[in-house]
Design a protein with these regions (language model features):
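Cap/lid segment of the alpha/beta-hydrolase catalytic domain
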Residues: 3-53, 110, 116-117
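Short alpha-helix in the alpha/beta-hydrolase fold that links the catalytic acid
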Residues: 153, 167-176
Length: 212
């Protein structure tokens, strides 16, 4: 069996009432870009800084459990979760397998160059951000591509050609940067979702790559 640990990046108690959760969520996702633009002017104050650091703390917790086999730490996610899976694999050498679906936060600053499409969260909707050099520097600093360079473990990446949330060009930016053992599953018809078959194949892949 597996130990499964699913994270919620905002530190919210999953037991709070749905109405309260929805109210807080609206606050995190306001009309000015929401939490993904919070602190973007300063890379040391950017909201996602504590999220990225939290990935390492999650692995600290998992590897402290007596049920852990002492060998394997697989990270998996889609969209923002796909981004965090790659980031975790790049930050922490305890990670042994990485699976990511259509990772967000990839090639974010591409919109600043004429004719290029950037990744989610699509800061092109907030033109002032793209005019701010400090914001662009922070985007580049936290971009998934930077962490993909540091990944050394087997990685399984999937994306679809009809995805307009995380465009396929941004997944290719990640794929082309990965220098580790890697495998891709391209699903041309897919938008921003995965099929049950894809999810199953990912679990098979993880099982095949477990350290015995």
């Amino acid at each position: 069996g597996f130990i499964r640990f699913e994270i919620e990046i905002h530190g919210l108690d999953p037991r709070i009432p749905t109405e309260t959760f929805n109210e807080i969520s609206r606050g995190f996702n306001d009309a000015n870009g929401g939490y993904l633009s919070n602190g973007l002017e300063d890379k040391n104050r950017y909201y996602m800084r504590h999220v990225y650091q939290g990935l390492v703390r999650c692995i600290d917790f998992l590897t402290s459990l007596p049920e852990w086999d002492g060998k394997n730490v697989a990270v998996q996610g889609g969209s923002q979760g796909g981004a965090l899976a790659i980031i975790a694999a790049g930050l922490d050498k305890r990670v042994t397998q990485c699976v990511a679906n259509h990772p967000a936060l990839s090639d974010m600053a591409a919109y600043a160059e004429k004719g290029r499409t950037g990744g989610y969260p699509h800061f092109t909707k907030y033109h002032e951000i793209l005019k701010n050099k400090d914001c662009l520097n922070t985007m580049a600093y936290y971009d998934v591509v930077n962490f993909a360079r540091k990944v050394t473990v087997p990685t399984y990446l999937t994306w679809g050609y009809n995805d307009i949330t995380c465009p396929p060009t941004t997944s290719y930016a990640v794929w082309n940067t990965l220098k580790c053992e890697k495998e891709a599953l391209l699903t041309p018809i897919n938008e921003h979702w995965t099929t049950n078959e894809t999810n199953y194949q990912q679990m098979v892949w993880i099982k095949e790559h477990l350290i015995k």
